[in-house]
Every structure is written in C-alpha cells, then in structure tokens.
Amino acid sequence: MPQPPFCLKVNERVDCLLMQNSILKKLNLEQKCALLSGDTVFTTRAYQKAGIPSITLSDGPNGVRKQAGAADHLGLNPSVPATCFPTAATVACSWDPALGEEIGQAMGEEAAAQEVAVLLGPGLNTKRSPLCGRNFEYFSEDPYLSGKMAASYVRGIQSNGISACPKHFAVNSQELRRMASDSVVDERTLRELYLTGFEIVVKEAKPKTIMSSYNLINGTYANENRHLLMDILRGEWGFDGAVVTDWGGSNDHALGVQNGSTLEMPAPGGDAVRELMQAVQSGKITEADVDARLDELLTLVFDTHAAVQSHSRTFDADAHHALARRAAAESIVLLKNENDLLPLAEGAKVAVIGDFAQTPRYQGAGSSAVNSIKVDTFLDCLKESGLASVGFAPGFDRQGKPDAAKQAEAVALAQKAEVVLLCLGLDEIKESEGLDRGDMRLADNQIELLKAVQQANPNTVVVLSAGASLETPWLKHCRTLVYGALGGQAGAGAMLDVLTGKVNPSGKLAETWVNAYADTPAKDNFAGPGRMVQYREGLYVGYRYYQTAGVPVAFPFGYGLSYTTFEYSDLKADEKGVTLTVTNTGSCAGAEIVQLYVAKPDAKIFRPAQELKGFAKIFLAPGESRTVSIALDDKAFRYWNVKTDRWEVEGGSYQLRVGASSADIRLTAEVSVKGTNAPDPYEGLDLLHYVSGQITYVTDAEFEALLGHPVPEDVVRIDRNMTLGEMDHGRSPLGWVAQKVLRYRLDSSFAKGTPDLNTVFQYNMPLRALAKMTNGMVSMGMVDGLVWELKGFWLVGILRVIYEFVKNLILNSQMENRLKNS
C-alpha cells in the first residue's frame, strides 16, 4: 500500500496537512463519505490508491480488549490476552495522577503492541448516583478529581503515539435506556459538574479522540449537539481531534458531521454513505463539512498508524503485572481498623472465608472486560504472605442463595483462627455495562455469614470487592473493613500486601459512602420509568449535596485510614494556592493525600458548601516533615453565569480549607478574591431549595426556573427512536409479540441470576440502531418500514421492509464495487 512517507516518518503537522489536502482533492464525494464510518466493528476504512490505511480501535479503560475473532461491543466474545489493571473507580482512590500516567503508558504500550491505534478510554462520567451500573469504569463524583486522573491516563496512553479516547461525552450517568434517554440539565450544572472533567482532559492532556455519548442532552443527541461539540469542545476548549460515536450512537449521521462528529462506528455500511451523500446533494450540509471531518480523521489515522507500525510487538507482561499490583495496593482504602487489628503480624493464624478468595471479583462486566494474562487469587497469594493459614471455606453461594452447610463450615473454621479474613463483595451480575444496580446492599447471605463468623471470632476483617459504594449497616459486625474495589489481575496480592503491612494503605474514597440509598440526591430522578432524566439536583451531587444539606454519611468523600498518623501545620495561603507542613507522627512510613477545598460561606450566588480544587499525595518516613504546595488554577473560584453566558467570579472572601478528607478539615485560611462584577444570574427567581441545598424538595416551578424553560413532555413516539422494549406502545401485533419475547428472555435471564447482556442491550436499543449496527444488512429505509408496521400500517410496512431490503442489497453491492475500483 502506498503511504504518505513524511506523515509516517516526520511528526510535523504542517506537512501532514499538505498531504491531507492533496488526498482530499483526489477523492470524490462517495469516497469521502465512506471514510467517515467504520469498515468493521473495530476498524476504519482503508483506501489503498490514496495511501490511506485502516486503523483499529479497541475497548480498554482498564486494559486492552482487542477481539481476535468475531467482534462485538459488549465484551461477550473472547479477546487477546492483556494486563487487567484496576478499574478507574479503584485507581481514583489512589489520588495519584503519576500512577495513572504509568498505568496509561503500560496500556498504551500493550495496545500498540497489538496494533491498536485508538484505545477507547478512560471513562470519566460523573457519578451522579451510586446505582449506575457502570460506575466501576468511572473515576469519581467530583469533576476535578475525575479530570486530573483521566488526564494522567490520556498522557500515558498517548506517550506511545496512539490515541486515548475519553468517554462518554457527556451527561451519561445511567445505563437504563442509555441510547434513548434525554438528560434534562441546566447550563450551569452541565458546565460545572458534567463538562469540567472533560475540559481538564482536553486542555491538559490533548486527547486525539473523544467519544460522544448515546443520550440526548436537553432534547438533542450528544453526537449531533452543536452546542456541545462545536461551541464548547472545539470552540471554547480548542479540541482539534476526532469525535467518535459510541457504538451505534449515531442518530442522524449528516447532522453529526455538520455539528462536529467525525467517525460513525461501528460499521453501518453503505446506507450511511448514501445518507451523507444525499445530505450534501440536498444542501442539508456542505461538502466543506465533510472535508473538515475527514481532515480530522486523516490526521488521526496517519498519526496513530505510524506509531503502531513502528512499535514493538512485545511488552514486559511481568513488569505490567507488578505495576498492576502496586496500583491496586496504593488504591486500597482502609475504612475501619478497630483496636489496630491491622497490620497482621508475620505468622498470624488466619482463616480465609468467602468465595471471592478463590474466584476473585477483579473487574467489571461488559465492553471493559479484559482477557487477563494471569489472575492472582487470594488463596494462592496467601502462601507467600507470611501468614499461617488454618484453612479456607467458601462460606456462601456467590449468587446469593442461602447455604446453611457452607455457613456452618465457615463458622467452625473461624473458631480455629486468631483472625478471620472474610472476603465479601458484589458478584458479577450486580455491576455491569447495560444494567443499573437495583440497590446498594450486600447480599443477605453474606451479611448473615458475617454475623455468624463475628460471633465465632470477633477478630474479623472484611475484605470487600465492589466497583461502587455500598450501604454498610453491618459495619458493627466486623472489627476491620478494607475496601479493595475492583483491583485488577494482581489485586489479591496487593490486598495481602496491605493486610500484612508490606504496604501502608493510603487510598482515600473518590466517592461518598452513604448510610442508605434514600439519602442520595438523585434518588427520585435516577433511572425512572420514562425516557426523560431530570437532573433536578443541579450542582448538588455527592459530597456537594451531603455537606450542604447536612446529611450524615457512613464514609465521607476523601476518607481513608492509615497505619500511621499525620499532622498538618503552618498553612500559608493566597488566591494562587496554599503551602503547609505535613508531618508523619506515627511509627511507620506512609502516604498522605492532602486535599484543598474552596468555600464561600457568604456567597450571594448559591453554591455547594465546599468544592475540591486541589490535592497532593506525599510519602513520608516516620517523623519526617515536608512542605506541601497546592496550586489553584483558573477553575478554583469560577461559576457559570447563565445571564452573561460565561465563567464569572464572585468577588470577596473565600475560605481555603485543607484536610485529610472532605469532613476532616485540619487548617483553614481566608483569602480575598477579585470578582468580575457580573449580574446575579438568578435575580428575581424563587430557588429556595437550591439556595439551601435541600434539593430533594425542589418543585416543578423551581426546576423550570433553573432550566430557564418548561420541562419537556415525556412521551413515547412511534418513530426511529422507539426502543425495542417500547414496541408494545405501537399498533402492530408483530411488534407486541416481539416485545413480549424480548421481555420474556430478559426476565428469564434475571430469574436465573445471569442477565443476558445482549438481550438487555437489544431491549433498550432504538430501532434506528438496527441500521447502525448490522454492517449494512439493515438500511434506514427498512427501519422506516418497520415504523410503518408499528403504526398499524401492517401490509404497507412489511412490503416496504422487503422492498428496502432488496434495494439495500443492490445499492450496497454497487457502492462496494465502485469503491474498490475507483
């Protein structure tokens, strides 16, 4: 294949632009349009005569998932072995961007070795609710922490010359109906909570691609949302890379191209090409729109293809396993350690109980699932830990069924040990792409086991595996609680390193753990019965809500214990940042995460009680003191003013609060900040509950005042965007039967305790996705025929489906021949 030689050898943007302009002039409209959609599930189209290679994209937020055979977007089919690193939710608890960059570098190295040009991650959606089934893939409830950690991953991945792909842009915080839901959110909340993390990534790490989300935002699909993609992403932030759709996430391909979306994935086939050509020919969009997107794509293709071609096809798997173990260890959070039960002394007699000890839960389910090169188990690593094992008992059924015999065996074993290491957690069904959690509870059989074991042996250490927070009413039944999250393939060894004191735990929570789900701010507006998702809580997500509204929590944001203690002193502050002294006052070395929160108690523009605006992680020997500096950036004091439509600063006195967690503030200083003298954006509006933070009482009128417009009507329409699960709303017996069959399959899989992810995806999939995810076998004309069928025009609908099917076959064949021979 002829290649543009200097684009492959010389990293000079100006030369590549000249070559790309030359290529663009040689391509006809059909060729251009064909390049803007995928060739297969994970590859782009190649044009040999023009010297345009194909590149491979692959899932990989916590490890590379390149599928060797039949490809799918849900992680159902096997993939090439790779290192499974701890998930983003886990590594976020390290609060260590340097560590994140190391992980990203290793993942990028493995991706390039497997000839992957674009690694689809990291994910940094804001954790609006603890029930989001994909929270294990996301960093935090706080956009600043999410942005800083995600930026570190992107820098690491792209240090190999390939592209990272931060996702899902934006306001995509639930799995239910994720391809059809409409996130109704006010502009200030959108900017401050749901876009700030992405802004940090774009400006600080310069990703080459970004993935748009499935959902609508205020009535417009994210992938064709001009305000999101052109005004903000490309305009305000200066992003000049490629925007890639989520798989099947394109609604109107032409509008996507016009409004800033570059590449439609996976492989919609010839119908997408014709759709784009017709849009140009009809004047709906211009050829200049197509050229702009193609220029972005060619830059990505030539840049990353060159990097992949020159990269080694091998990597040091042992070194990456060691990194995965270190990352997991630095991310483990010690939540309770009564009477300093940990660390365990060498030779301590321990009983290991819990199914997770023999079959670890170390990653989430769905498209992020990695085919791990190897997986350490707790039982195997125990042999090298220096502890004396008195035996193992599974203790409980993993899927939650009562088992008295297993529990009795575990209790008997517990009585023989000095300490019980009880491995509990959420099973694979509880947390998955495509599914939201139904509750925040640990399985009843695990709680009953804990109570029984604790009665037999009070020295019970709960080792918890879960990708998101849990309710902990059972906390009093254990002396120690250690949260390992989802620790990746080396997580078991990392946990034993912490339990035995080889590693002093330094992780701190990146999300609040509440006492009960009923305490969460979005409880009444998360994953409801309709398509519309009202973000009524506004700015008050996570600790921003709990601390403003005075809601007690189990474990606050930023919380985590250590085997040593730290003292804070000598705080000096101004509007540019703080310096202070931190001293290790304990008897062992350890790391402390110093957190900087900004507050304005006398604010005239309502805001949360305090917000994270900086942090630093430092390692100190016993008795060692060190000066810590934390700088404040341009986001420290700003708020989005909906009246001036820009970032503003309210002038006056601010508190800079430095602490070991959001609830453990050690030092406070006041600084004076010059304001921008902007008008009050909420003057004359009745926003009582937003001012107080008591947002669970927000009225319809208040929310509409915050939005600046009425809440749209939530209706199911019989059109291309009706989901397969909504076909019972139509007027077609065939649709009713199809919906009932899907519902039966779905319910049956749940009843068996093994939800079928493919059926879940299909049930929540809009009809248009049939034309976007079948490699050209289904056209949008066929979908329109199906819509006619569902509207009750049965014969006309069926005949149109048949006609469009034949037409699509002929047109696809003709187009492919033209593309091959041109």
Functional labels for PLM-detected ranges:
Residues 754-822:
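C-terminal non-catalytic accessory extensions
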Residues 669-737:
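Charged, amphipathic alpha-helical linkers/stalks
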Residues 2, 7-635, 639, 653-657, ...:
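Glycoside hydrolase catalytic-domain context in secreted enzymes
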Residues 29, 41, 281, 299-302, ...:
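Generic surface-pattern signal
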Residues 634-681:
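Terminal connector regions
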Residues 10, 39, 174, 712, ...:
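Enrichment for repetitive, rod-forming helical segments
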Residues 715, 719-776:
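Long, charged, low-complexity terminal extensions
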